[in-house]
């Protein structure tokens, strides 16, 4: 973590339709080039379209949604995939699954969030659940992006990312 290049961060959840999409878009929005965020899932949505409510709250927050899609985490284990510096699971199911081998053995962390797509109720209630998840993710990412990443070793990056799970 000692050069000036941006760090690649991969966010994982089961379907890559809500939480990991929110995290990818938010980190790319707030990082000012310090990070390049990606997202994927173990069982992505077949139509490759993120949850419409996830896209709606991102747009409402002024975060770009261009290029967001649900995709398999397998594409990030391929030899020509971007090298990841950090892989973060954002749902408990993905955290418990056997992940692919990530080239370069990136640092890992788990930041669990409740699945907003499982909230029952009116569209307004569901949309509020997505907004609250976005707020939680952004709060943690604001702390993450303020870390002195250039001076962190891989182990220190991993420890710092894991400590943020408690925030």
Question: How would you label these PLM feature ranges?
Answer:
Residues 2-78:
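Conserved active-site segments centered on acidic
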Residues 17, 92-95:
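Short glycine-rich anion-binding loops that position phosphate/pyrophosphate groups of nucleotides
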Residues 47-48, 95-97:
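Short, charged/polar "capping" segments at the starts of alpha-helices
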Residues 82-83:
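Alpha-helix C-terminal capping/helix-to-coil transition sites in glycosyltransferase folds
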Residues 86:
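Short, Asp-centered acidic motifs that coordinate Mg2+ and/or phosphate
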Residues 89-90, 110:
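Redox-cofactor binding/interface segments in oxidoreductases and associated redox assembly factors
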Residues 98-167:
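Phosphate-binding/catalytic loops
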């Amino acid at each position: 973590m000692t050069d000036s290049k941006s760090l690649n961060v991969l966010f994982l959840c089961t379907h890559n339709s809500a939480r990991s999409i929110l995290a990818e878009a938010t980190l790319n929005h707030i990082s000012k080039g310090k990070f390049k965020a990606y997202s994927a899932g173990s069982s992505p949505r077949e139509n490759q379209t993120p949850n419409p409510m996830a896209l709606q709250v991102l747009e409402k927050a002024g975060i770009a949604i261009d290029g967001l899609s649900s995709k398999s985490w397998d594409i990030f284990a391929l030899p020509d995939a971007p090298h990841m510096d950090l892989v973060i699971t954002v749902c408990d199911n993905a955290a418990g699954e056997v992940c692919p081998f990530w080239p370069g053995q990136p640092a890992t962390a788990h930041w669990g969030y409740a699945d907003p797509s499982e909230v029952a109720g009116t569209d307004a209630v569901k949309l509020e659940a997505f907004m609250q998840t976005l707020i939680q993710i952004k709060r943690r990412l604001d702390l993450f992006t303020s870390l002195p990443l250039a001076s962190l070793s891989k182990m220190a990056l991993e420890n710092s990312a894991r400590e943020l799970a408690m925030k």
